[in-house]
């Protein structure tokens, strides 16, 4: 068996495409899937107890799984940069506990949302749907 994946299925020529017996359209993650993705990607991060993954899932509607991973990585980078840029930061010294980044907050995620738009536009979603209908993707 051969499995292929593409972000632009409409760019594939018909002789190549017809060799695939099944075509599967994978849509953007649902609310539940986004919540699961935020649970997965924020689990290792230090976050404020008021950060709720169900709220993040609602906030980031229209974002792909890859976008959500990028958002979580951006959050971690944000608090690390803030630590390094703070006047209290000093190079670690043996015998002293190093300073730790602050906990990620909902405000941090809201700020990241203003800086990162979804990678998939409504125009692209319409094109995927049209292709899916035309080629009877599952």
Please describe what each predicted stretch is:
Residues 35-47, 55, 59, 74-82:
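Conserved AAA+ ATPase "sensor/coupling" helix adjacent to the nucleotide-binding pocket
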Residues 7, 21, 29-33, 48-51, ...:
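Eukaryote-biased feature marking scaffold/signaling PDZ-domain proteins and nuclear chromatin regulators
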Residues 16, 24, 28, 41-49, ...:
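Conserved NTP-handling cores and scaffolds of large molecular machines
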Residues 1-3, 10, 57-72, 80-138:
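C-terminal engagement/docking regions of AAA+ P-loop ATPases
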Residues 1, 13-43, 52-55, 70:
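Conserved AAA+ ATPase core "coupling" helix
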Residues 27-30, 48-52, 127-130, 135-138:
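Glycine-rich loops and low-complexity Gly/Arg-rich segments
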């Amino acid at each position: 068996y051969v499995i292929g994946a593409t972000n632009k299925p409409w760019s594939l020529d018909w002789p190549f495409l017809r060799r695939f017996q099944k075509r599967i359209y994978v849509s953007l993650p649902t609310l539940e899937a986004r919540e699961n993705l935020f649970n997965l990607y924020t689990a290792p991060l230090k976050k404020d107890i008021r950060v709720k993954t169900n709220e993040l899932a609602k906030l980031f509607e229209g974002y792909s799984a890859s976008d959500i991973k990028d958002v979580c990585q951006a959050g971690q980078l944000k608090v690390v940069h803030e630590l390094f840029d703070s006047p209290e930061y000093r190079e670690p010294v043996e015998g002293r506990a190093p300073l730790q980044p602050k906990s990620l907050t909902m405000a941090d995620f809201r700020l990241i949302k203003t800086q990162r738009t979804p990678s998939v536009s409504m125009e692209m979603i319409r094109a995927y749907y049209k292709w899916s209908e035309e080629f009877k993707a599952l």
